[in-house]
Each structure stands twice: as structure tokens, then as C-alpha cells.
């Protein structure tokens, strides 16, 4: 399951790492936009298999940030 950015912003912090167990609703990435920090949560429970962003990276709304299987 793809975890996508719900806003355009900058990756402020990565909360989970490849191989970590992730629960539904767990914050995987924190985005910063207009000086506000917004968590991007996993919609499913599983294991983080891919991380497609890095801290400080600018991302567009809809960009795939991570993958949980």
C-alpha cells in the first residue's frame, strides 16, 4: 500500500525505517508546510518495505513517500 503526501511541502522528519512494523494510523513521515508540521499516517498495518523520500526533500501532493506491505 502506497503512503502518499496529502499536501505539498518538505519532508521534515522520517519516523519509521525500512523493516519497521507499522500500525494503521502510525505516523511514518512528518511533512512541513507553511511552518506547520503534519503527520503522514499509514492507512494499513504491515511492514515498511520502501522509503521513497529523505529529510529535507520537497514533495508534491500525491507523491508516494513510502510503501507498506
Language model segments and positions:
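Secondary-structure boundary/capping motif
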Residues: 1, 13, 25, 30, ...
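Short beta-strand-turn/beta-hairpin segments enriched in glycine/proline and small hydrophobics
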Residues: 1-10, 27-43
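Short histidine-centered loop motifs in beta-beta connectors
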Residues: 7, 12-21, 50-53
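Short hydrophobic beta/alpha edge segments that flank linear recognition/processing sites
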Residues: 23-39, 60-69
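A cross-kingdom feature marking charged/low-complexity
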Residues: 55-57
Amino acid at each position: 500500500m502506497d503512503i502518499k503526501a496529502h499536501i505539498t511541502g518538505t519532508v521534515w522528519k522520517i519516523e519509521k525505517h525500512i523493516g519497521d512494523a507499522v500500525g494503521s494510523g502510525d505516523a511514518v513521515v512528518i511533512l512541513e508546510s507553511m511552518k506547520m508540521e503534519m503527520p503522514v499516517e499509514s492507512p494499513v498495518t504491515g511492514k515498511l518495505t520502501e522509503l521513497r523520500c529523505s529529510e529535507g526533500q520537497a514533495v508534491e501532493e500525491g507523491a508516494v513517500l513510502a510503501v507498506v506491505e
